[in-house]
Amino acid sequence: MLYPICIEKVNDGYVVSVPDVPGCFSAGDTLSEAMLNAKEAISFHIEGMLEDDEELPKSNPIEQYINQPEYKDFIVTVVDVDLTHLMGKAEKINITVPALLLHRIDQFIATHPEYKNRSNFLSQLATNRLLSA
């Protein structure tokens, strides 16, 4: 799931806010560290929301924040947060897909290691679609 983050440079590093996840903040000494910490903060924050039976926040397009006056001096970007591990125990299902589509999925997975396998790919796409709806 892609979440927009707004990064502010401060004297001793970077502070990150996550506008689509109220109350979620992070920081880092370097820009890279701040972005990695933001991914972890979002995951932990959403895990807590699930434990409290709260509705999951929807992710808005990054364009919604780029031209906002309150983020004028911020770096606005997105981080990809895998939320599938928070969805509970995996259940095996049997699906039917056209051969060409399956071939294209396999080709895509081969060049995108963040998708571990077909199941992970389909789970992440379904999660992203349902949380963006």
From Swiss-Prot:
Gene3D superfamilies: 3.30.160.250
InterPro entries cross-referenced by the UniProt entry: HicB-like (IPR031807), TA_system_antitoxin (IPR051404), TTHA1013/TTHA0281-like (IPR035069)
Protein name (record): Uncharacterized 14.9 kDa protein in rep-hol intergenic region
Similarity annotation: To E.coli ydcQ.
The organism's place on the tree of life at top rank: Viruses
Pfam family membership, one: HicB_lk_antitox
Organismal lineage: Viruses, Duplodnaviria, Heunggongvirae, Uroviricota, Caudoviricetes
